[in-house]
UniProtKB/Swiss-Prot annotation:
<dbReference type="GO" id="GO:0019843">
    <property type="term" value="F:rRNA binding"/>
</dbReference>
<protein>
    <recommendedName>
        <fullName>Large ribosomal subunit protein uL22</fullName>
    </recommendedName>
</protein>
<dbReference type="Pfam" id="PF00237">
    <property type="entry name" value="Ribosomal_L22"/>
</dbReference>
<comment type="function">
    <text>The globular domain of the protein is located near the polypeptide exit tunnel on the outside of the subunit, while an extended beta-hairpin is found that lines the wall of the exit tunnel in the center of the 70S ribosome.</text>
</comment>
<dbReference type="InterPro" id="IPR047867">
    <property type="entry name" value="Ribosomal_uL22_bac/org-type"/>
</dbReference>
<dbReference type="GO" id="GO:0022625">
    <property type="term" value="C:cytosolic large ribosomal subunit"/>
</dbReference>
<keyword id="KW-0687">Ribonucleoprotein</keyword>
<keyword id="KW-0699">rRNA-binding</keyword>
<dbReference type="InterPro" id="IPR018260">
    <property type="entry name" value="Ribosomal_uL22_CS"/>
</dbReference>
<comment type="similarity">
    <text>Belongs to the universal ribosomal protein uL22 family.</text>
</comment>
<comment type="subunit">
    <text>Part of the 50S ribosomal subunit.</text>
</comment>
<keyword id="KW-0694">RNA-binding</keyword>
<comment type="function">
    <text>This protein binds specifically to 23S rRNA; its binding is stimulated by other ribosomal proteins, e.g. L4, L17, and L20. It is important during the early stages of 50S assembly. It makes multiple contacts with different domains of the 23S rRNA in the assembled 50S subunit and ribosome.</text>
</comment>
<keyword id="KW-0689">Ribosomal protein</keyword>
<dbReference type="GO" id="GO:0006412">
    <property type="term" value="P:translation"/>
</dbReference>
<dbReference type="GO" id="GO:0003735">
    <property type="term" value="F:structural constituent of ribosome"/>
</dbReference>
<dbReference type="InterPro" id="IPR036394">
    <property type="entry name" value="Ribosomal_uL22_sf"/>
</dbReference>
């Protein structure tokens, strides 16, 4: 299945409070699939990360429809990746006056859609 990368449209969600590795687990399932297939998969996957990914996917398709005038039924996910965002640093009190650092990870989710040729 060939994809027209010249008309690629993307959407980005930044500072999502989730580990990038957990988001990548879902994105790896979506890459290369059609928009309709991806919607069905995201609806029934049992992962917490599906919700923000679904929002980004819908945003990318809305961008393609509004800005480029593309047909949503012809769109394929050409790129899908999650990059590391800044970590929120928290401390957990431990015995004898010590404290351990806890890093709450964030990520940036990017999804690009392109029409099928």
């Amino acid at each position: 299945m060939a994809v027209d990368t010249a008309n690629e449209v993307k959407a980005i969600a930044r500072y999502i409070r989730m580990s990038p590795s957990k988001v990548r687990r879902v994105l790896d399932q979506l890459r290369g699939r059609s928009y309709r297939e991806a919607l069905i998969l995201l609806e029934f996957m049992p992962y917490k990360s599906c919700e923000p990914i679904l929002k980004v996917l819908r945003s990318a398709v809305a961008n393609a429809e509004h800005n480029q005038g593309l047909d949503p039924t012809q769109l394929v996910i050409s790129q899908a990746y999650a990059d590391m965002g800044p970590s929120l640093k928290r401390f957990r009190p431990r015995a004898q006056g010590r404290a351990y650092q806890i890093r709450k990870q964030t990520c940036h989710i990017t999804i690009a859609v392109a029409p099928q040729v």
